[in-house]
Amino acid sequence: EDHPVHNLGEHSVCDSVSAWVTKTTATDIKGNTVTVMENVNLDNKVYKEYFFETKCKNPNPEPSGCRGIDSSHWNSYCTETDTFIKALTMEGNQASWRFIRIETACVCVITKKKGN
């Protein structure tokens, strides 16, 4: 794409896309699947829960994997990393604030090729 840094010869090893999203389910910090509350009532006001996520556009931006990696010595691919943030959730009939997993970055994973 025509990002200003590309004019300077700078490129990301993995392309990502970020957006505000809503969630209906998520994985909590204990690994349980929980229901994310669509609306949060605080002080008689209703707020919608949004989460800012970053995902990989493509796990292999180049045929050999990540952009700029020497494929003669390295295997590579792009993958998402995540973190935990607080969200109002339901598990069974229990509503509470829990840490849920959201995707926050797209990074390049490399492994050395055998015989190198």
Swiss-Prot record:
Belongs to the NGF-beta family. It is found in: Secreted. Gene3D superfamilies: Cystine-knot cytokines. Keywords: Disulfide bond, Growth factor, Lipid-binding, Metalloenzyme inhibitor, Metalloprotease inhibitor, Protease inhibitor, Secreted, Toxin. This is Venom nerve growth factor. Not glycosylated. Its main location: secreted. A 1,2-diacyl-sn-glycerol binds at K86. GO terms for cellular component: axon; dendrite; extracellular space; synaptic vesicle. GO terms for molecular function: growth factor activity; lipid binding; metalloendopeptidase inhibitor activity; nerve growth factor receptor binding; toxin activity. Expressed by the venom gland. GO terms for biological process: cell surface receptor protein tyrosine kinase signaling pathway; modulation of chemical synaptic transmission; negative regulation of neuron apoptotic process; nerve development; nerve growth factor signaling pathway; neuron projection morphogenesis. Disulfide bonds join C14-C78, C56-C106, C66-C108. Nerve growth factor is important for the development and maintenance of the sympathetic and sensory nervous systems. It stimulates division and differentiation of sympathetic and embryonic sensory neurons as well as basal forebrain cholinergic neurons in the brain. Its relevance in the snake venom is not clear. However, it has been shown to inhibit metalloproteinase-dependent proteolysis of platelet glycoprotein Ib alpha, suggesting a metalloproteinase inhibition to prevent metalloprotease autodigestion and/or protection against prey proteases. The lineage of its organism: Eukaryota, Metazoa, Chordata, Craniata, Vertebrata. It comes from the Eukaryota. Homodimer; non-covalently linked. Interacts with NTRK1. The keyword Magnesium does not apply.
